[in-house]
Amino acid sequence: ENIEILNRYHGVRVRNLKTGIRYAAIIHLNGNFTIGTYESDIEAAIAYNKAIDILIKKGVSRNFTPNYIESLSPSAYADIYSEVSVSRKILDYRPI
């Protein structure tokens, strides 16, 4: 099989920096908003999910597709979810 999965998770992009590989979580609202940059794709995927939750609570009505991380137990997911940071732009976002 010649299939290589480049982006396993919605809203996660790989960044090759001088300091190494990092993962950016980005969500599209009225343009792209960077949620944050993380050490792992799983952290970035969970940050994307957290941003979705925040935006829905703020009244944004979009059909965002959340990420499902099969490799984590619910408690491990919850631990990362509670610790992962989300950019101030998402926290302060006001729907139009």
Model-predicted segments: where are they?
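Boundary-flanking segments of nucleic-acid-binding domains in nuclear regulatory proteins
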Residues: E1-I96
